[in-house]
């Protein structure tokens, strides 16, 4: 193993990278509330893992979605546990994100020179809420159906562009298969990809600028 490590070290300078990560200065005022962002990231990773596992069984059609979720909960090995963890971590992610935003605001972490870090954080907060909206519809039960119908109907009040926007969200004039397909694609591919990009930007800026000092 040492020869393998030496070979990698010679080419990648692993030790230098490890030293840079572990030797980063942490201000003395940092407390447990500064861990809320990291907990949010952990919840996101749990979401990715459990969500990926459920894609093996979930069927995004209006005729099979509910039955496939029922199969996950009652017949698939550990399916009930995986889906339950997915739901619990989703709620935890939203809660930790809200608390993280409050912590940053109350401690002035959004001030110069960290304005862009705050902006990317706000975008991540919107993306987190979007995960909740799109994921809520996927079981395609009564609650999910009517939630989607109400949420996608809200933009209709916007003058001129309201109706076209509603049709864009739903995929048609009414809520149906096109709507479920759109929400499934958003929830499992588009939103995770965008979230990963903004998280990378967010963490790189934190890494570069460091943790903000006390007020």
Curated annotation (Swiss-Prot):
CDD domains: Cytochrome_b_N
Principal location listed in the UniProt entry: plastid
Transmembrane segments: 32-52, 90-110, 116-136, 186-206
Cofactor dependency: heme b; heme c
Annotated keywords: Electron transport, Heme, Iron, Membrane, Metal-binding, Photosynthesis, Plastid, Thylakoid, Transmembrane, Transmembrane helix, Transport
Binding, heme c: 35
Cofactor detail note: Binds 2 heme b groups non-covalently with two histidine residues as axial ligands.
Domain of life: Eukaryota
Molecular function terms from GO: electron transporter, transferring electrons within cytochrome b6/f complex of photosystem II activity; metal ion binding; oxidoreductase activity
InterPro entries: Cyt_b/b6_N, Cyt_B6_PetB, Cytb/b6-like_sf, Cytochrome_b_N_euk/bac, Di-haem_cyt_TM
Function recorded in the entry: Component of the cytochrome b6-f complex, which mediates electron transfer between photosystem II (PSII) and photosystem I (PSI), cyclic electron flow around PSI, and state transitions.
Family to which this protein belongs: Belongs to the cytochrome b family. PetB subfamily.
Other remarks on this protein: Heme 1 (or BH or b566) is high-potential and absorbs at about 566 nm, and heme 2 (or BL or b562) is low-potential and absorbs at about 562 nm.
Protein name, UniProt field: Cytochrome b6
Organism, as annotated: Cuscuta reflexa
């Amino acid at each position: 193993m040492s020869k393998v490590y030496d070979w990698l070290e010679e080419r990648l300078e692993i030790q230098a990278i490890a030293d840079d990560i572990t030797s980063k200065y942490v201000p003395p005022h940092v407390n447990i509330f500064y861990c809320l962002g990291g907990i949010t990231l952990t919840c996101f990773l749990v979401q990715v893992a459990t969500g990926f596992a459920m894609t093996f069984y979930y069927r995004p059609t209006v005729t099979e979605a509910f039955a496939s979720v029922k199969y996950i909960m009652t017949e698939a090995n550990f399916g009930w546990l995986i889906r339950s963890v997915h739901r619990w971590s989703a709620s935890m992610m939203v809660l930790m994100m809200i608390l993280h935003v409050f912590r940053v605001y109350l401690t002035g972490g959004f001030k110069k020179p960290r304005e862009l870090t705050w902006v990317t954080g706000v975008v991540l907060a919107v993306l987190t809420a979007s995960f909740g909206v799109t994921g809520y519809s996927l079981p395609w039960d009564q609650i999910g159906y009517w939630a989607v119908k109400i949420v996608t109907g809200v933009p209709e009040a916007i003058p001129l562009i309201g109706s076209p926007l509603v049709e864009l969200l739903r995929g048609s004039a009414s809520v149906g298969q096109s709507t479920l397909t759109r929400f499934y694609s958003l929830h499992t591919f588009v939103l995770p990809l965008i979230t990963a990009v903004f998280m990378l930007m967010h963490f790189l800026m934190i890494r570069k600028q460091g943790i903000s000092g006390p007020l």
